[in-house]
Amino acid sequence: MAASPGMDALHVSMYEPSESINDSRMHDWDATADLIDLAHRRGIDVLALYGDPAWPEADMRCNAHRQPPRSFSPLELMNWVAKYNESRPDYRFDGVTLDVESASGFDETLEGNKYWLEGLLALYKCTLETLPADLKLAVTIKDSCDSVDVAFEGSVKPTCQHIIDLANKVLETVIVAGYRDSADGTIDRIGNEVA
């Protein structure tokens, strides 16, 4: 099959709120293999997407296990992807996407929140250091990440610039998302586009 024009990657949310029969928090592995097979036959990479606003906190960054009552750590989720890939060698994920946005109402310009942003950058770095070499890493960021300067690896500059620097070195993709706290206006917009 030919590659789909203009589309080269799917970033698929794989988080399942309850443990599955695979002892993971991933969707059904057979259905996942079917999706990956279909995408790969069209020349499209598939990356498992995960995220949690708590991950940039110091106790969550690259710990192997969650810190109760927190969610699962990024390393546990990467391990599940690696475990899935081992069990389905013909239908492997091509990478992992970290979709770590701040909680609703988060103000990046507040001094205390700089630590969260610095933690986010540290999370990306330690994820890169522990991610299996055969998996790509993509990240999703807010469209407002340039509003405050933070310190990272010896320099102080806007968070977005640090992420761009990482992207130029090692990140597969940086997705810029315009998050919304409500769906106000969405129905009208969809109605206008469909009409």
Task: Please tell me what each predicted stretch does.
Residues 1, 27-35, 77-85, 143-166, ...:
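Alpha-helical scaffolding within the catalytic cores
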Residues 1-39:
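N-terminal carbohydrate-binding/catalytic regions of secreted carbohydrate-active enzymes
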Residues 7, 12-19, 93-94, 100-104, ...:
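Aromatic- and acid-rich polysaccharide-binding/catalytic face
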Residues 9-11, 43-49, 90-97, 134-140, ...:
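Structural preference for beta-strand elements that scaffold enzyme active sites
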Residues 11-16, 78-116:
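Active-site groove signature of glycoside hydrolases
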Residues 32-37, 45-91:
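Active-site-adjacent "subsite" loops/lids of carbohydrate-active enzymes
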Residues 45-56, 117-159:
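Aromatic-lined carbohydrate-recognition surfaces of secreted/lumenal glycan-active proteins
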Residues 117, 121, 125, 133-137, ...:
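Glycoside hydrolase catalytic-domain groove-lining segments
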